[in-house]
């Protein structure tokens, strides 16, 4: 018998929970009820799952004892890789893995990418992204087939900075500063532009047809802000719930955008 005070981790292939729209993805609610009853002695159960090839932390208010880490793929998205494809997951996360440790009952998870070790984000100068979108012929094909997908070539994205922070956990704060002045940051669910041009556009070049599963693409850990200028550097700071600085880097603008973007 496992003592009720122990830290419990449950590993599954498919996510037990998913995002706000789909909640349980492939799992029937009755199965979650069974798991909840099975672990009723434990105050907290950490779920580790895969399948989705993306990085996502989820909780469900109906099942407060569980939290879940949807893990990225070590291959990125190997099923659709091509010669021009970086090792990326569909949400733009760099391919990698999570190292979990427990100290005094407290769980800690660290993301490790294959190529860049502890890299936790990618920042985009949306002026450069917009220029790419406006001038690429395959983007025009995509706009025709998928009018509801993000069109980063539009004026509304001018001077914006996007930060895909796949290390995000609840309580983390993403702050952006332009020449020392803070910018208003919002969390969005917009798709990752690098994954789009690396995977979706080459696929359209091969077979320009509509696929229902590609009609809506999101990244759950994307943050956006509009800068005051087009060229000033933007400092990125990430802190945890206690205000401890976790990461700091500077986005130098203009920053080139193409399939080799880092």
What does each model-found stretch correspond to?
Residues 57-59, 185, 248:
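Residue-level detector of high-confidence beta-strand sites
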Residues 243-262:
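Short beta-strand elements
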């Amino acid at each position: 018998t496992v003592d009720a005070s122990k830290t419990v981790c449950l590993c599954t292939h498919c996510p037990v929970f998913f995002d706000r729209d789909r909640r349980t993805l492939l799992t029937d609610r009755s199965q979650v009820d069974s798991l909840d009853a099975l672990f009723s002695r434990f105050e907290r159960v950490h779920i580790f799952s895969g399948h989705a090839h993306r990085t996502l932390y989820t909780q469900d208010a109906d099942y407060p004892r569980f939290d879940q880490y949807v893990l990225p793929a070590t291959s990125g998205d190997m099923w659709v890789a091509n010669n021009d494809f970086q090792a990326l997951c569909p949400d733009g996360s760099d391919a990698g893995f999570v190292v979990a440790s427990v100290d005094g009952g407290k769980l800690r998870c660290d993301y490790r990418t294959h190529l860049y070790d502890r890299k936790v984000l990618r920042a985009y100068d949306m002026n450069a992204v917009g220029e790419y979108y406006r001038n690429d012929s395959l983007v025009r094909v995509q706009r025709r087939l998928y009018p509801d997908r993000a069109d980063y070539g539009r004026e509304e994205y001018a001077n914006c900075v996007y930060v895909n922070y796949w290390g995000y956990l609840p309580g983390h704060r993403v702050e952006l500063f332009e020449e020392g002045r803070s910018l208003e940051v919002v969390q969005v669910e917009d798709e990752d532009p690098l994954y789009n041009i690396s995977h979706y556009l080459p696929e359209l070049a091969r077979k320009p047809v509509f696929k229902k599963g590609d009609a809506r693409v999101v990244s759950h850990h994307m943050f956006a802000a509009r800068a005051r200028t087009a060229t000033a550097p933007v400092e990125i700071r990430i802190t945890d719930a206690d205000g401890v600085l976790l990461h700091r880097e500077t986005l130098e603008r203009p920053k080139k955008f193409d399939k080799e973007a880092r």
